[in-house]
Amino acid sequence: MSQLLLFTILVFSSVFVIGSLSFIPPPHPFDPLTEIELNLVRNIINERYPIGLEHRFTFQYVGLNEPDKSLVLSWVSSQYHNVKSPPRQAFVIARDHGKTREIVVDFASQAIVSEKIHVGNGYPMLTIDEQQATSELVLKFKPFRDSIRRRGLNVSEVVVTTSTMGWFGEAKPERLIKKRPFYLNGSVNTYLRPIEGMTIIVNLDQMKVTKFRDRFTSPLPNAKGTEFRISKLKPPFGPSLQNAVLFQSEGPGFKIDGHTNRWANWEFHMSFDVRAGLVISLASIFDMDVNKYRQVLYKGHLSEIFVPYMDPSEDWYFRTFFDCGEFGCGQYAVSLEPYTDCPGNAAFMDGVFASQDGTPIKITNVMCIFEKYAGDIMWRHTEIEIPGLKVRPDVSLVVRMVTTVGNYDYIVDYEFKPSGSIKIGVGLTGVLEVKPVKYVNTSEIKEDDIHGTIVADNTIGVNHDHFVTYRLDLDIDGTDNSFVRSELVTKRTPKSVNTPRKSYWTTKRLKAEELLVVNPSRKTKHGNEVGYRLLHGPASEGPLLAQDDYPQIRAAFTNYNVWITPYNNTEVWASGLYADRSQGDDTLAVWSQRNRKIEKTDIVMWYTVGFHHVPCQEDFPTMPTLFGGFELRPTNFFEQNPDLKTKPIKLNTTPTCTARND
């Protein structure tokens, strides 16, 4: 670290400790809140409300208050950012004596500038602290301990996790959660040894167990076969894989300045939010023909992950999780491991969020950035009559985050290509949610439907869905965009055309609500509207729940893969600002019923990647990664192939590989 930088940090810290009238905000309006800012928010609010669980005032969410978009774009477009930066503020959701408060803190004035009490349905996302506190509460609860002993189990080997309650028609549901016990005793794979048949409900505002019942139902699955640690597994082992390393003799091709990344012809900003996790903003691509960067994506991030299970029994019907809105996809983001989660050429960045009492918590290596080359071809061509060929390797830049919400791990990738494409992918791995049964073979099953698959002795992997919804504020060459669809239709060849062909297909443009975002005010030299096309990838299934089923009412945003809404900085979370125990009255599906203009205006695309997961034995004890995603691909955005003038990669030495003869 340079002496100048070190001195700046020391002075900066000293200013904060003394009293931060000279508080200096981060250089970029989209930079995530820093540890200093989070501490400042805590101190400012603490002057009005005593903080801490004993005072019943807790921070449920602290994030950057969305700055005015016009001010951000004005700041970005100024050559040296010499216009005034948008006001920097924090948005806080807190619980205070059974009420939900929304507070806005302004850093310039170091004061609360807005405050109101939420009076609608739903509750804010759970904190890690209150989940841990309720687990300890249950473990000390005498009726629970007695039940564990009556089952012949050791209380010290029991762990307790949290499930949200969902909503099933209650007029004004309380802030309750369900707690679920699991048994270790020979396994670290917690979720594969559920202690089924217990109903444990905890009131979060009162911090007490309000309902307990033990029905002593199913047997406990055996610990055998649940191990996944290589150090504990026994031979024979699988094939040895050679380490595949991308060697960059001249170093990485990207440059990170603060939270801004510049690579090839791309420039974009990376941030972190406790609910969304990784956030990509202000993605622009350089166009050589006009010698400037052109806008593509103003902001993109995870909005929600809806995971409903398909077992209607008492122990399972409520398992209809909203991972981002109830638990926080950023709150449960994990530290990435170099060389395994990310390749050896990756750079890493940390993330920070506020704990329940407002103090900062750092997640080291919460995101990684790396150049990816898997042997794919960017473009190539061979002319038979002309010696030689032209080919370019397909190198891309990936920004990655992994969030582990309960038993599932989600690998979230944003992949930028020199062609102008942005590929957004999500990988599902981790551990199944399982149900203990008396069966060990399908021949023993008596019921019509066991709601899953026998994956091990006395163990059913329960059928479920994953719906991963993204919010994508696309600004294709500006903010005045429209959404259209190009439909393929069959047309008979006119007899007047001298050809032996009888048919062909062409495009017929319809104004609709899927597949293509264009800017009607920007056209190519040949008159085509500049745009970006949405290409569906693997996993684009829709919901199969009845639309009047309570979970689907709350998750009606999954009814379609694609939604288009006009830009509104309050419409960020597809499940609503308050997802826990919500009633579906403030979701993307509700906003879309307002019938607002989506032509030649600032619009937002919402896309849902959908998986129907019928578990199989290969998913046990850990699940091989299953990928889905989609691509945003330039369509008449450029005058020609932007990769055409990409220079070939020069190799200083030619690598040689020979097959092993073992």
From Swiss-Prot:
Assembly information from the UniProt record: Homodimer.
Cofactor(s) the record lists: Cu cation; Mn(2+); L-topaquinone
EC main group: oxidoreductase
Lineage: Eukaryota, Viridiplantae, Streptophyta, Embryophyta, Tracheophyta
Active site, UniProt feature: D323, Y408
Signal sequence extent: 1-22
One GO molecular-function entry: copper ion binding
Keywords: Copper, Disulfide bond, Glycoprotein, Manganese, Metal-binding, Oxidoreductase, Signal, TPQ
Catalytic activity: a primary methyl amine + O2 + H2O = an aldehyde + H2O2 + NH4(+)
InterPro entries per record: Cu_Am_Ox_Cu-bd, Cu_Am_ox_TPQ-bd, Cu_amine_oxidase, Cu_amine_oxidase_C, Cu_amine_oxidase_C_sf, Cu_amine_oxidase_N-reg, Cu_amine_oxidase_N2, Cu_amine_oxidase_N3
Annotated protein name in UniProt: Primary amine oxidase 2
Record text on cofactor binding: Binds 1 copper ion per subunit.
Family in the record: Belongs to the copper/topaquinone oxidase family.
Residues involved in Cu cation binding: H464, H466, H613
Gene3D superfamilies documented for this protein: 3.10.450.40, Copper amine oxidase, catalytic domain
